[in-house]
Structure formats: C-alpha cells, structure tokens
Amino acid sequence: RIVIPVHFAGQSCDMQRIHALSKKYGFRIIEDASHAVGGRYQGQPVGNCRYSDITIFSFHPVKIITTAEGGVALTNDAALAARMASLRSHGITRDSSLMQSPSDGPWYYQQLELGFNYRMTDMQAALGCSQIKRLDDYVARRHRIAQRYDSKLAQLDVTLPHQSSDSHSALHLYPVQVDPGKRLQVFTALREAGIGVNVHYIPVHRQPYYEALGFRAGQFPNAERYYAGAISLPMFPTLTETDQDTVIRALEAALR
C-alpha cells in the first residue's frame, strides 16, 4: 500500500504525522512535490525523504524551475534508487554483477524487466542546472509577491491561502477562494480583462476515467467544496507590482 501526499501550491503536507500513520498502518510514502521544489518543511528542504520513501519533483515548463519536460525522483534507499535507475532506461543493465547469466563481453547488456524510456537529455539537464542556481531567489521573489497579495486582498471578500507554520512554501500557486456562486462571474471577468487566472484543480474523482472505476460525486466533499470557489491568481517571479495592482483592481471590480 502506498500513500502519495501532494504538496499543493508549494506547501508541504504534515509529513511527520503522515509518517507516523505509515508506521501504524503499514503503508509506504511517495511525496508528490511537483509544486514544492525550493520549499522547506520543519526547516529542511522538501525532498530530503526524512519521512518518505521517495519524493518526486516536476520540471514541467510552468513549474518553479524547468527542464522543458521531465522531473526527478529522490530517495535515501539504495535499492529503490537502483530499481528506479533500471526502470528509467528500459530495465537494461550493463553491470555484470546484476546479470542472470555470464556476460559475452564488454558490449553485453541484459534487459532484466520491462522498463521505460524516461531518460532526460543532457540539454534538458543543463537547462535545469542553470536554473537551480537561482532557485532560492525565485522562491524569495514569490514570497514577496504573495505578501503583497496578502496585504492588498485582506479587505476583499476572498479567503487567502493558508500558510502552515512548519512549512516554508515554494508558492508555486496563489489560490484564493471566492463565493462559489460568483466564481464563474469572477473568473470570466478576469479573463476578459486579459488576466491569466486559472482553477487548480478539478477533483480527480470527477474525471471520467476515475468515475469508470467507481468513484462518485460526494465521496470527497472537502475537495469538491474547495474546487467550487477556487481561483488561482497570477504568480511568477517576473510579475511586476504594476501588473499585480492591475490584477487586484480587476478582482475587486469583479467581486462587486
């Protein structure tokens, strides 16, 4: 059994408590930290796997840093690392100590299992390496933008994103909650004003694939309640104060 906590919007889940539950109920943990590269939990970088078996990061173009596509999986378990390395490259090994029969020569390899072609190119890796040097600056800039949103939206009829005291969010997103009855009106008005708002996310169990597996509306009421009023405001390091003020004025007008 595996539990996959998602560090939504860049803020870490309470991994210490989830880890305690894993010991009680006997499940493994894979952290989905796609939003949280550069974030911290209990003062330590997200991805250190103190409370999990594996942590995954996404480097999709809209994430905090990018390699154009792809990502990484981190672990402190040598056996898991070796298995992931094998699966990444078609399940092939050139390590004679892992082969099931003697090697024919230095050219020899064996496919031990049916893996995947998940190899990142050198060019993609170089792009990621160049960006990771600026990761702390990117996250710091996102925090300044979020603090400004917090201050200027405090008097509006919106619920601001919760920030946990033991998590330093990477602030991949800045999602607010509006009156569900006004969400479509607000979203449409902001889009018509040229502001790239979005909704993160449609609950997974409402997608046809999962409905075909037996999931139904009402089974996850908190997710559905959150979705009903969710709108994500623009959040990226190069967002200027002038543009941010435009977003805030448009949101204020749309809420009237």
Regions found by a protein language model. Give the residues of each.
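Conserved PLP phosphate-binding loop immediately N-terminal to the Schiff-base lysine helix
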Residues: I2-I18, F27-S58, I64
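PLP-dependent aminotransferase class I/II
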Residues: I2-V6, Q11-H19, K24, R40, ...
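Short hydrophobic "helix-edge" motifs at membrane interfaces and signal-peptide entry regions
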Residues: S22-K23, N48-Y51, T66-A68, E224-R225
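Acidic active-site catalytic centers that drive phospho-/nucleotidyl reactions
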Residues: E31-D32, E69, D122, P234
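Active-site PLP attachment segment
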Residues: R50-R94
